[in-house]
Swiss-Prot record:
InterPro entries: QueC (IPR018317), Rossmann-like_a/b/a_fold (IPR014729)
GO molecular function list: ATP binding; ligase activity, forming carbon-nitrogen bonds; zinc ion binding
Top EC class of this enzyme: ligase
Protein name: 7-cyano-7-deazaguanine synthase
Species the sequence originates in: Albidiferax ferrireducens (strain ATCC BAA-621 / DSM 15236 / T118)
Enzyme Commission numbers on file: 6.3.4.20
Binding site for Zn(2+): 205, 220, 223, 226
Cofactor binding comment, as recorded: Binds 1 zinc ion per subunit.
Family membership noted in the UniProt record: Belongs to the QueC family.
Catalysed reactions, as listed in the record: 7-carboxy-7-deazaguanine + NH4(+) + ATP = 7-cyano-7-deazaguanine + ADP + phosphate + H2O + H(+)
Taxonomy, superkingdom: Bacteria
Lineage: Bacteria, Pseudomonadati, Pseudomonadota, Betaproteobacteria, Burkholderiales
Length: 243
């Protein structure tokens, strides 16, 4: 039976929902993030705020929340010519992929996370990648994650489990999952409390915009990440209203 987990935690909506899920399942949960000189570097500030808010608002989870790890991955920014690591406009490439795709990003993240998990004796890695609302990123595919799980388990001679709780659900369902997890957290009114925390403190916008406040949170409102988050929130609210 697995009792420990390492969550790849960027400070965004998806990884915060994954963190809540891990805290609801496991006895000890640690977090990891990567500074690869991303344009939306504000997410690294957001994640610390989110961690503090979880500790303050959800005491039963706080007792399980362990060490946070931040790794410097500047080399990824140096070898990547994308709109997430360069000041360039968002567009679709001839390959059919958006220029927000950072080649090898999730592969490196998982490899380094596995090395930390190995050292910290953490049995499960949890990541928020998904195929449903994704932008065509090949390193978010279920097949990719399963291949990485096998390669890392063989290469480190340790059986790793990579959980992807959002793999087959869309953004509306991700909002709903956050509400459900909050309701089961032991905190009175925890469902809305977790949704409000995600709205107010998590960061998704590729441009790093924390000036413009929307019903679903902060962001420019026009980048692909903001559009996905906004549409998901609208559908979530509509479903809640419909009952």
């Amino acid at each position: 039976m697995h009792t420990t987990a390492l969550v790849l935690f960027s400070g965004g909506q998806d990884s915060t929902t994954c963190l809540a899920l891990a805290l609801s399942k496991y006895q000890r949960v640690e977090t990891i993030a990567f500074d690869y000189r991303q344009r939306h570097l504000v997410e690294l500030d957001a994640r610390l705020i989110v961690l503090n808010e979880i500790r303050a608002r959800f005491p039963q989870w706080a007792s399980k929340l362990g060490e946070d790890h931040l790794l410097d991955l500047a080399v990824l920014g140096e070898v990547s010519d994308t709109s997430l690591t360069r000041d360039t406009a968002f567009k679709m490439e001839q390959s059919g992929l958006p220029n927000t795709f950072v080649p090898g990003r999730n592969l490196l993240f998982l490899t380094l996370a596995a090395a930390v998990a190995y050292r910290r004796d953490l049995q499960v890695m949890v990541t928020g990648v998904c195929e449903t609302d994704f932008s065509g990123y090949p390193d978010c595919r279920d097949d990719t994650i399963k291949a990485m799980q096998l390669a890392l388990s063989l290469g480190m001679d340790k059986r790793f489990l990579i959980e992807t709780p959002l793999m087959w659900i869309d953004k509306a369902a991700t909002w709903a999952l956050a509400y459900e997890l909050g309701e089961k957290s032991g905190t009175p009114g925890g469902g809305q409390a977790l949704v409000d925390l995600i709205i107010e403190h998590t960061h998704t916008c590729y441009l790093g915009d924390r000036q413009h406040r929307h019903a679903w949170g902060y962001g420019c409102g026009s980048c692909p990440a903001c559009e996905l988050r906004a549409r998901g929130y609208e559908r979530y609210c509509a479903a809640r209203t419909a009952g």
